[in-house]
Every structure is written in structure tokens, then in C-alpha cells.
Amino acid sequence: MAIPVIDFSKLNGEEREKTLSEIARACEEWGFFQLVNHGIPLELLNKVKKLSSDCYKTEREEAFKTSNPVKLLNELVQKNSGEKLENVDWEDVFTLLDHNQNEWPSNIKETMGEYREEVRKLASKMMEVMDENLGLPKGYIKKAFNEGMEDGEETAFFGTKVSHYPPCPHPELVNGLRAHTDAGGVVLLFQDDEYDGLQVLKDGEWIDVQPLPNAIVINTGDQIEVLSNGRYKSAWHRVLAREEGNRRSIASFYNPSYKAAIGPAAVAEEEGSEKKYPKFVFGDYMDVYANQKFMPKEPRFLAVKSL
């Protein structure tokens, strides 16, 4: 079993309806799928790959060797207790945001700025596809994420998490990234095309998200689940630690503004059914998520203050 791979370019041709159906089915049955022919230039993707890997080697690799995950793993190995590090991720991370560009590594600033704009455009297109498949007005999801604003400067949160999962001497004792669902909206992942490790939970089984050169992996977060009234599900996923290879992962998140009110869209409800989720302010949801990220998601929807 493998996650769906969808040719996004066919949205503009004779196979549009088939492609829309494939995306709808992937959102409903998986919450994860891969896009090929998505429109982001290959030359740009190659630059992003090289610069991200170079940045890790020159600016982050040495620091990771003395990081908390390394120290804790070494201590655990010395104890030889048979335990596993349950609350630690074997991951190096830095985050790129619009307002912290002065903190971006200088050698990647121009390229990553260009890449983020391309990914932001792809996120908008994907949300419009979801609008259409859910029977929502065009632009509904994006408008909801931007506090109901249709024009002007976007208020939605758009961040890019650049991760590396370095070789781990004891991958059986630590997670690359613990299992979780994503809190926000639409996630667009440019993952390593050589080293695997990302898995998604499907029908009780962990399925590898197969490396596919220059594809963009799409996954739906908790807020898409809420807006669709459960028709689309946010999927549990994790990253395994590896003994060999330094796995690269560049995930961009198009999330609601912290002030945005999120709830099931009326047209997304099945006829005769009740709303399955409360309406809440996304920032309030994030307050709950911060303490419950790696726990079952259903209690989060109950714990958040409803409007």
C-alpha cells in the first residue's frame, strides 16, 4: 500500500474531473498525498535541496552533536535499561517566517524566499480545490483562515520548518519525530528524495511515504478536518530515526490566523447531520495543542473554548 500520487497539471486539462476526484478521495481516505507536476520550477527545487543541506553542514551539524537529544540518548545507552526516549525527537529544526527574515541564514535567504512564495501560491490553489470538492464557494477556506478578509494583506500564518534527521547510532531507542497530527490547515512538504522515514497511519498500519523526487507531499491538518465537518481527516504521522543518512524535510504550513474563528462550514455538513466540531478561535486551539500535540486529537476539540 502506498499513499496516492496525483498529477496536479491535469487539473487544467480534459482530466480535470478525474483529478478533482482523486484529490477528494485522498483527502477523505488518507489525509496525505503526493503532487507531481505541481508547477514549482525544478531548478528552484534543486537549489533548495542543495542550500538546505549545505546550511545544515556548515551552520548546524556541530551544534547538533552536543544537543539535548544526543546527550539524553548517550545517557540512556549508558544506563542500558531497555527504555526508549519517549519525549524527545532526533531532529534539528529552524523555522522561516515572514517577520523573522533578518534571522534567516544569509546563504539561503533569497532562494528560500522565492521557494516560500511558490509554495504559498500552491497552497492557495490546493485550498481552492478543496473548496470545490467540498461544495464551498471559491476562496472559502482561505478567507476563513484570514479572519474573513477577502482583500488586502493576508493575516493567515505561513511558516516553513526546515528539518534534518541526522544519522542516529541507536534508532530503536528514539523517534525522529513523535506521532502527531498537524494543528493547522494545509501542509506542503518537500521531503528528501533519497532517505525515507516519514510514515502515515492508515487503517491501523504505518505506511511509508515513499521518497519521490521533486514531489510535494500534501497533508491536511486539524482545521481542515473541522471545516469539512470530519469529511477530511487530519492524519497521524511520524518520522523514524535512521542509522544512516541525513534526511532533509522542508514543511510549509498554511494555517489560520491566531484570531480566526474556525468551525464546520454549513455546506460541508451532510444533510440531516449535526456539526461534529465546535466553533473556536484558532489561537485558543493552539493553546490546547501546545500541551497535547502528541496525544489523541479528539480531546483537543472538546477542551478548546467554543464560541
Curated annotation (Swiss-Prot):
What protein is this chain from? 1-aminocyclopropane-1-carboxylate oxidase 5
Name the coiled-coil region(s).
106-134
User: Keywords in UniProt for this one?
Assistant: Coiled coil, Ethylene biosynthesis, Iron, Metal-binding, Oxidoreductase, Plant defense, Vitamin C
Question: Cofactor(s) for this protein?
Answer: Fe(2+)
From the UniProt record, give the pathway where this protein acts: Alkene biosynthesis; ethylene biosynthesis via S-adenosyl-L-methionine; ethylene from S-adenosyl-L-methionine: step 2/2
In terms of InterPro entries, this protein maps to: DIOX_N, IPNS-like_FE2OG_OXY, IPNS-like_sf, Oxoglu/Fe-dep_dioxygenase_dom, Plant_2OG-oxidoreductases
Instruction: Name a biological process GO annotation.
Output: ethylene biosynthetic process
Report the co-factor binding details: Binds 1 Fe(2+) ion per subunit.
Q: Which enzyme class, named as a word?
A: oxidoreductase
Q: Which family does it belong to?
A: Belongs to the iron/ascorbate-dependent oxidoreductase family.
Q: Which residues does the record give as 2-oxoglutarate binding sites?
A: 247
Which reactions are catalysed by this chain?
1-aminocyclopropane-1-carboxylate + L-ascorbate + O2 = ethene + L-dehydroascorbate + hydrogen cyanide + CO2 + 2 H2O
Q: Does the keyword Magnesium apply?
A: no
Source organism of the structure = Arabidopsis thaliana
Q: Which Pfam families does this chain map to?
A: 2OG-FeII_Oxy (PF03171), DIOX_N (PF14226)
Q: What EC number(s) does the entry state?
A: 1.14.17.4
The protein's matches in SUPFAM superfamilies, at most eight in alphabetical order, are given as: Clavaminate synthase-like
Pinpoint the Fe2OG dioxygenase domain residues: 152-256
Q: What Gene Ontology molecular function terms does this protein carry? A: 1-aminocyclopropane-1-carboxylate oxidase activity; L-ascorbic acid binding; metal ion binding
Where on this chain does Fe cation bind?
180, 182, 237
> What's this protein's function?
Enzyme involved in the ethylene biosynthesis.
